[in-house]
């Protein structure tokens, strides 16, 4: 991926209310193999993170100046170093106001992937390790720990500039379990949530379950299509790309590539044509299957606790809201 501009600054700050001290770099980093490796590893770690949110910029204001500075840089009114200096000074101020914040190296990278321009911003920390020297001595060594990436954002510059209706050109890591630690970083970017990734993913899985039921698919076909959906969505999440409903529909049924897409539109699930997949929600979407003499059962894991209840003590499976076709067959049997 071509790196257009990249720079790192350091904010020295402990989470004890002490002042944040900025050590700013005066010039951009030169492009190198090490820099390309760092950005590739950062993207890989970022894409793998669960609990990300997607959104858009707040209206530019004194509280949210970042988008204005970014626009000025992209319009050629200031260079990348000056833009990053303005931004990191603003981050330093917000860190001082947040007693929970911890400093670190702040990376700004403007790069291109395919035909799309991105800006990545991440707060990086070191971990202590060891290394073996040329003299075969063991010595302490520090390394950037991208496995502990907790504060980062990625802005799809091309989407922001070319699609004024978009509500998902920014992604950022949210604090776990409602923690407020990351709020100051979200405010630094000036981002508001625009797309509910977990909610959209849950709706997709509900629409797919309804589709499988309405098509009365054999168990093997249902299992294969479920595997296709989860594989596609997980792959998109790993690459940091959104789910595209039309593309997914074509993969689910190559002979009728519009069938699933038309099912979604006709039933009015209210889903966006594109949205980010939530990996945590996807991990819950697996099929339980079982066979015995004269019996075959298959259902999605997310139905446990709602439509399906497992009573281990009595060795029973309780099914609520039976499929219409099954009920019709049972009624005809009684008649």
UniProtKB/Swiss-Prot annotation:
Compartments, record wording: Cytoplasm, Nucleoid
Coiled coil (residue ranges): none
Domain of life: Bacteria
Keywords associated with the record: Cytoplasm
Chief place of localization: cytoplasm
Family annotation (InterPro entries): Nucleoid_associated_NdpA (IPR007358)
GO cellular component entries: bacterial nucleoid; cytoplasm
One Pfam family from the record: NA37
UniProt key word Methyltransferase: no
GO molecular-function terms, A-Z: double-stranded DNA binding; single-stranded RNA binding
Family listed: Belongs to the YejK family.
Protein's name in the database: Nucleoid-associated protein Pmen_3549
Native organism taxonomy: Bacteria, Pseudomonadati, Pseudomonadota, Gammaproteobacteria, Pseudomonadales
